[in-house]
From Swiss-Prot:
Organism: Francisella tularensis subsp. holarctica (strain LVS)
Protein name listed in UniProt: Peptide chain release factor 3
Biological classification of the source: Bacteria, Pseudomonadati, Pseudomonadota, Gammaproteobacteria, Thiotrichales
Gene3D superfamilies the record matches: P-loop containing nucleotide triphosphate hydrolases, Peptide chain release factor 3, domain III, Translation factors
Entries under CDD domains matching the protein: RF3, RF3_III
Entry annotated with the keyword RNA-binding: no
């Protein structure tokens, strides 16, 4: 195998999906610890001490203890190159998370074993199922009193509609948690408390019978019965079913104590797929093609206050990036030279010399790159499936200093290009209406406008509950519609015509009266 193909085969690009507070940031930190990317793990709980989780780098995230934006971390493990996309943990940032899932080849689902499958996990799994993304599952927090593990497997199978194949099994839980038993290698790993900040060589015992004294006779007998039950009732691991997205290998542990994470990572790097082929409008692109192709799935403004710029997160789908190369921007039809692409480590930026399929690199963006843009080495090719969602909450932006209107408009449009909020300019007023999927984005925008654009604003209620993008192939009918409904119409930050409805009934009536007009809740970037 050539060096080029070896490099592609090494890549594993994935995201972690979970409900907020299931332990995603903690497990991210432990993975970085195993990949030698950090020397000590700072947990989210240690925020008051000034130790902040490495992946939560934006100021507001540090204050609130949530992962607002997606950061990308690359590190080596088990002879693989891991590209970990850390996704927003807070429920208000689901749109960003959705788009991140378009850039990965597999996903790690973290379940809080105390609470079981939660709402946010269900939504994210639905996104993964659209693309048959392979899923590995980690049942977290077994050092607490959790739900029954068999019950947890049942819940995952019934609610998320995916078969579970337990790879190991917990021995007790809470204060009686003694470790895990490897169902495939007949090996017990014993748990000890107090090793969460380091890589600790937990004691392993080969053969279940040899661990009887270490775990105690009662737990041993319970474990024997449970193992018989699990082997009879659950699915065996099948690699093909996993790769097709029909079955998930399940690992048990506690990320806070760094227990069970290594076993999960070993399984993940062994079974998760290398970069996969990608669908474009024109054809399917294979990862091992020689020419560079890829797409932008995220834009982040002002990642570094020292550099007032924007970075476009670019997923390489095929070929090799080399410093200084020229690439073709499909949407604009122009050539671009990339002299200073970046690689990331949660806010630490360094220039990257080369990149292969599966890698995420940062392109400096001075306003010409948008989410969903495709780049090639000359071929006219656009990758599919990077959506924009209609916001669900709307507010009117009120400017404290009327002389700063230009700066406000610029700031709102630039921040909306990152995809967490959307800005609308109504036809018949000078208002600016901000829309978002959740309430928290409004706080984030106000704070970032103040710190990055020196604009202070507040919000007022606005008579809008729903937004739909308007499309019509008949220009005359579209113009008639614009005249008739100008009181409800606006342009979004990208210039797309949008219908802002005060009520669901209003929207329904408008749709019924205008059958030739398409009212869409999503639009492709």
């Amino acid at each position: 195998m050539s060096e080029y193909l070896q490099q592609i085969a090494k890549r594993r690009t994935f995201a972690i999906i979970s409900h907020p507070d299931a332990g995603k940031t903690t497990i991210t930190e432990k993975m970085l610890l195993f990949g030698n990317a950090i020397k000590t793990a700072g947990t989210v709980k240690a925020k008051k001490s000034g130790i902040h989780a490495t992946s939560d780098w934006m100021e507001m995230e540090k204050q609130r203890g949530i992962s607002i934006t997606t950061s990308v971390m690359q590190f080596p493990y088990n002879g693989r190159i891991i590209n970990l996309l850390d996704t927003p943990g807070h429920e208000d940032f689901s749109e960003d998370t959705y788009r991140t899932l378009t850039a990965v080849d597999s996903a790690l689902m973290v379940v809080d074993a105390v609470k079981g499958v939660e709402d946010r996990t269900i939504k994210l799994m639905n996104v993964c199922r659209l693309r048959d993304t392979p899923i590995v599952t980690f049942m977290n927090k077994f050092d607490r009193d959790t739900r029954d593990p068999l019950e947890l497997l049942d819940e995952v199978e019934n609610i998320l509609k995916i078969k579970c194949a337990p790879m190991n099994w917990p021995i007790g839980m809470g204060k009686y948690f003694k470790g895990v038993y490897d169902l495939y290698n007949d090996e017990v790993t014993l748990f000890e408390t107090g090793h969460g900040h380091e890589i600790y060589p937990y004691k392993k015992i080969k053969g279940l019978a040899n661990a009887k004294d270490s775990i105690g006779i009662d737990l041993y007998e319970d474990l024997e019965m449970e193992i018989d039950l699990v082997r009879g009732a659950s699915h065996e691991f099948d690699e093909q079913e996993f790769l097709e997205g029909n079955l998930t290998p399940v690992y048990f542990g506690t990320a806070l104590s760094n227990f069970g994470v290594k076993e999960m990572m070993d399984g993940f790097t062994r079974y998760a797929p290398a970069p996969q082929h990608r669908e474009a409008d024109q054809r399917v692109v294979a990862a091992d093609e020689q020419k560079l192709t890829g797409f932008v799935f995220k834009i982040q403004a002002n990642m570094d206050e020292k550099h007032r710029n924007r970075i476009a997160f670019f997923r390489i789908c095929s070929g090799k990036y080399e410093k200084g190369m020229k690439i073709f921007h499909e949407r604009t039809g122009k050539q671009m030279q990339i002299s200073k692409a970046l690689t990331f480590m949660a806010g630490e930026r360094e220039q990257v010399e080369e990149g292969y399929a599966g890698d995420i690199i940062g392109l400096h963006n001075h306003g010409s790159i948008q989410i969903g843009d495709s780049f090639t080495q000359g071929e006219k090719l656009k990758f599919k499936g990077i959506p924009n969602f209609a916001p669900e909450i709307f507010k009117r932006v009120k400017l404290n200093d009327p002389l700063k209107m230009k700066a406000l408009q610029k700031g709102l449009v630039q921040l909306s290009e990152e995809g967490a909020t959307q800005v609308f300019k109504p036809f018949i007023s000078n208002d600016l209406v901000l829309g978002a999927v959740g309430v928290l984005q409004f706080d984030v925008v106000a704070q970032r406008l103040a710190s990055e654009y020196n604009v202070k604003c507040s919000y007022e209620g606005v008579n809008v509950t729903l937004a739909r993008w308007i499309f019509c192939n008949d220009e005359k009918k579209l113009n008639d519609f614009k005249k008739k409904y100008e009181v409800n119409l606006a342009y979004d930050g990208a210039g797309y015509l949008t219908y802002l409805a005060p009520t669901g009934v209003n929207l329904q009536l408008a749709q019924e009266k205008n059958p030739d007009i398409i009212f869409s809740a999503t639009r492709e970037h």
